[in-house]
Amino acid sequence: MANKKYEIRYLPTFISQFNNILYYITYELKNKIAADNFYNEVVKQIEIISNAPESYEVYKTIKDEKIKYYKINVKNYTIFYVVKDNIMEIRRIYYSARNFDNLI
């Protein structure tokens, strides 16, 4: 049986956070090549997981969430997403060393 491809939806919060990270790498660290590589890697990994997003790690939050969050790591960052029907909703991206419990 073929894997079902999920529609990818990026929430504005994720887009804003991702743009801030890319800006930081490009202008603060002065490394446009690293920013481009990071952008490409994030997009690639999201495309890959969209084939089977529910097979990735579930994030166990301390909050009583009714929504099941999944997470993937790309370089030093963690991306959080949820799955609703045939939609994979990309919600947040954080530096992996952060404590996520109060953020998700």
Please provide the spans of the model-predicted regions.
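Arg/Lys-rich, positively charged N-terminal/basic patches that mediate binding to nucleic acids
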Residues: 1-41
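Residue-level signal for pocket-adjacent positions within structured domains
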Residues: 3, 57, 95-98
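Generic beta-structure capping elements
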Residues: 11-13, 52, 93
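Secondary-structure transition/capping residues
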Residues: 25, 32, 36, 53-60, ...
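Enriched for short, Lys/Arg-rich terminal
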Residues: 29, 67-70, 74-78, 82-104
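Compact soluble domain cores
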Residues: 41-47
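A short, surface-exposed loop/turn module that caps and links secondary-structure elements
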Residues: 47-73
